[in-house]
Each structure stands twice: as structure tokens, then as C-alpha cells.
Amino acid sequence: MSASQNIVVSETTMSSIIPNNNNNNNNSSSQKLPPCLISISKKKLLKNIDIINGGGQRINAWVDSMRASSPTHLKSLPSSISTQQQLNSWIMQHPSALEKFEQIMEASRGKQIVMFLDYDGTLSPIVDDPDKAFMSSKMRRTVKKLAKCFPTAIVTGRCIDKVYNFVKLAELYYAGSHGMDIKGPAKGFSRHKRVKQSLLYQPANDYLPMIDEVYRQLLEKTKSTPGAKVENHKFCASVHFRCVDEKKWSELVLQVRSVLKKFPTLQLTQGRKVFEIRPMIEWDKGKALEFLLESLGFGNTNNVFPVYIGDDRTDEDAFKMLRDRGEGFGILVSKFPKDTDASYSLQDPSEVMDFLRRLVEWKQMQPRM
């Protein structure tokens, strides 16, 4: 992705090393946990101070990025290139996963398919109020059938409790807070031999009090901005600006930055009409995907075929991990061309459901081993 498409701002004012919380009793002694250390260099420190204290030009750059975070039309093109040509070119590079279904299944032959699904914009439509992003009963039934056929995980920026209240399927893996809160299926619900029932991993456990305090301060600071909505996702916080008047965006940027100045070990990232505040550790949806594959026994093997479906910038870490791994692929959910590491595309949650249904039908037609 280009820099304008994948902005990560680290709000840092001190050099530090943050260790992984390996003393957490929730970690299984037999589970090989990936390292989770981050060192902040002096060069990065100075750069982050500049970001925090930047003037109007820096704020304008953020506002421009906010406009681009949820495109509603094709990006502007040179006059010599038509929008249809641009769309056709993008589709050639990221063809429909429905149209290429047989080709995808051929690539998976002889391998264990493992499914990873984002929630908002993938299993449910994007809505103005994140508390009303309900999954349809048809989608729930489809995902339930999918989990009978393949190990299946929900990987989301939401906290696990909130997304579980939407999905309500105990047989799934859940990776909430952008993968910083991972739980396995409820005891007795998994149909897959490799699943570890006691799986629980929280690499940012030490940050819980800090996130609670940031949430409280953001709630207070942004209450003067109509339409702003602050959420606590347990291991990260978010500020939604989908319902904020564009004239108020600069004000909102200042409010968020004024809070983060006090918390040097947190970073600010941007998704679709939302700011995400999370711990500055080497952990994202891509790392969560790696951890889950390791937990399933597929850490160092080539007989697995992971499929990740998502619509947001934060899903790009998972897409890139799969591309670098050279196994499986990512599917971007979008009606508009975007820079992405995904291999295929689907337009909206209805197409996602169609793709998942075809996967279930394909699996049911395979001879039992």
C-alpha cells in the first residue's frame, strides 16, 4: 500500500522497551508464543515528537487522509485514463473471488483450508452507529456451516465480548482488539481435532489500565464534537468520525492528539472513518493470523491454505502476511479500487456470504478421507 493509504502515527515521547507479558497465567505452557518486543529509536522518537507538535500543515494531511479513509467514488485519474479503464485494470489485478472460485479451489487441493474473517464491512454492513452493525441471520447460519467444514476465526478491531454478542457462535476462534485478545472455541464446540480448547492469548495485558484511562479522556475531550463516538475495545480504543461534519475534522484531530501526548507508549492508526488508539507493540492482525495458524499446528508446514477476508486498512497486515508466506490468499471487500496486498476481491457482505456458501457446498461434495 502507498503511504497515503496506510498511515500509522506513533505518538511517542520517550525511548523504551516494552516486554511481552509472559507471566500471564492464561498462556498455555505448551504454546510457543511469538516475541512481542518493541524498541523505540532516537530517530523515531524525534519524528514522533514532530508529528505530535506539528502545525496546520500536519493537521491538513490528517484531514486529507480522513477523506480518503472510506472512498465513495473512484479516485481522480489523469484525463488520458477513463474511470472504466482504471476499474478494469484493478479488477484484472484483483479478480472476483466468486468468478475465480474454481481456480481458488484447485490451488487449495490437498491442503487444509483455514478461514479468517473480519466483521464490520465483511460479515455485516458498515453503518453509522457501530453498536447497530448487526449480522443477518442468513450470514450467521452461513458462518456456522462454514465452521463445521473448516477452522474459522473472526479477526476484528472490536473487543471480543462485543463481537461475540453480534456473532453468537461458540465454535469459532475470536481475535479481538486487532488480534490482541485471542480466544479459542468454547469447550466442546470445536469439530476440528487440531483446535486447542484452552487457547487464550493477550499480548497487551499490561495496557488495560492505560486504555481505560485513554478512553475516559477521549470521551471527555470529544464530547464537544457532534457525531464523534468513542469506544473501548479492551486492548485498544477508537474514535469514529463517520457522523462528524467534515468542517469539524480538524478540531477532532487536535482533540485526539492532545490526549495521546500524555501516553507515549500508544500509537494512532486510521481505518475506515475511524481513529484507532492501541499499544505500541509489534502486534497486528497479521501477527494474530500467524499465532492462530501456529496454534492449529500449521506454523511450519505447507499443507495449509489460509483465506483472510476483510475490508479495512488494518486487514492489510494479514493480507501482506499471507502474500509473504506464499500460502493462501487475501480477499478485499470493496466496490472501489484500493491499493491492497489482497489477491482477490468481493464487492460487499452479500458477495462474501455467496463465497462462503460456495465453500461449504464445495467441502460437502468432497469425498470423506
Curated annotation (Swiss-Prot):
Its cofactor is a divalent metal cation. One of its GO terms (biological process) is trehalose biosynthetic process. Its EC number is 3.1.3.12. It catalyses: alpha,alpha-trehalose 6-phosphate + H2O = alpha,alpha-trehalose + phosphate. It is an enzyme of class 3 (hydrolase). InterPro entries: HAD-like_sf, HAD-SF_hydro_IIB, HAD_sf, OTSB-like, Trehalose_PPase. The keyword Hydrolase applies. Keywords: Hydrolase, Stress response. One of its GO terms (molecular function) is trehalose-phosphatase activity. The keyword Hydrolase applies. It comes from the Eukaryota. Disulfide bonds: none annotated. Pathway: Glycan biosynthesis; trehalose biosynthesis. PANTHER family: TREHALOSE 6-PHOSPHATE PHOSPHATASE (PTHR43768), TREHALOSE-PHOSPHATE PHOSPHATASE I-RELATED (PTHR43768:SF50). Belongs to the trehalose phosphatase family. NCBIfam families: HAD-SF-IIB (TIGR01484), T6PP (TIGR00685). Removes the phosphate from trehalose 6-phosphate to produce free trehalose. Trehalose accumulation in plant may improve abiotic stress tolerance. This is Probable trehalose-phosphate phosphatase I. It comes from Arabidopsis thaliana (Mouse-ear cress).
